[in-house]
Amino acid sequence: MKCKYAWSHLDLKSGGFAPCFRFKRNDFVESDIDKLPSQVINNADFVKVRQQLRNDEWPAGCIDCQIQEESGLSSYRTRSLENTIHTDPDYESDTIHIKDLQLKMTRACNYKCRHCDTSSNSRFEQTGKDNPTIELKLKKDFNFSHISPPTNKIDIPDDRVMDDLFDNVLPTVENIEFSGGEPFYTRDMYKTLQRMIDDPRIDTKKISLVYNSNMSILEYKGWTVKTLWPHFKRVSVTVSLDGTGDLFNYFRTDGDYQTVLKNIVEVAPLVHNFLFVCTTSAYHAFYMNEIYNDFLDIKKLIPTKKVNIRTTFVHWPQAMDIVNLEEDVKDKILEELVVNDFTAEFAKRLKGNRTLEEPKFKELVRLQDELYDVSCKTLAHKVWDYINE
């Protein structure tokens, strides 16, 4: 099996380094946060992953892609092979040079999304402190650390790591992907771009930038992407649109759908291409036709830009996984679903094997509505109808 991530990519995750942003690094022993990027990219941990993939074996850390591919879906691995933003690696080699770097400059986010947790969003920690009873119930009944103290929070690169990247990785890197948290929600992201522009060892005109963003803001505390992006080869933006319209505002607490649309149109002249991704949970399962039609309307707002749309899926917490809805509910959703390029993988996933014996989504909806003091009756009426059947 080939994977551009395993042979080209470096990511800083909770506790240390990994070859992919989805990789579960539980069995890594030589790639902890005390190491430098240049020390880990060809160590025993990383080489073992490449060797296993070359032998058509799934590394333990690749469980997300394994689940997707065994369900007949595309995966992060298969989609990486379609990525032409950087040159192809030598898949026969165990040692590599990093061409694709992922940086998470903050764990802060200005949204509170229902599928996220404290490991990726520091704002949830205070929410948990303010709601200890709900925090405990989410953890105990759903195995969901939504607002619990983080045990595996994102590690943010410190000065030591950043200096090593500037010395040993960035001068030859071809692509940098910023995620988070929300990447536009920290001065460190903007400062990193400016430092690269100012560094004579780095030719930013040869470096592409990719963002995973909720597109809620374009500037932060005096910094703006508008003056920085023109110095780079090109910019691609993956917009996390987990729902549209009222469903978006309901699922993504503190989000405003119209503001996101305005920002997309405003920044479009600086962007080479957009990818709109709906991280699909049981909340979204009732709205896939509407989401698709709304995505088509967004494409009309930026007609001169290359725009793609796709789904990905929530597996954890299991109660939010679409496969764990009631069987009759899934059958009804499939009956009403218009299958197209956007919804086809959703239909496949919906037919997948259950991972919970008993559905628990209704209970989770009620608990999260209580937590966020909002009712699906007003913003997600199809979810309301479902939980009151």
Give residue spans per PLM region:
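Accessory C-terminal segments flanking Radical SAM cores
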Residues: 1-81, 313-389
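A Trp-anchored, charged/polar loop motif used as the substrate-binding/catalytic surface
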Residues: 43, 86-92, 155-167
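Recognition helices and adjacent regulatory flanks at domain boundaries
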Residues: 64-100, 109-111, 131-132
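Short functional micro-motifs and their immediate structural scaffolds
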Residues: 70, 114, 121
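Core AdoMet radical
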Residues: 98-108, 117-159, 171-189, 199-221, ...
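Distinct, well-ordered alpha-helical segments
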Residues: 188-194, 220-228, 287-291
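Acidic (Asp/Glu)-rich catalytic clusters
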Residues: 226-233, 268, 299
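Catalytic cores of alpha/beta
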Residues: 282-298
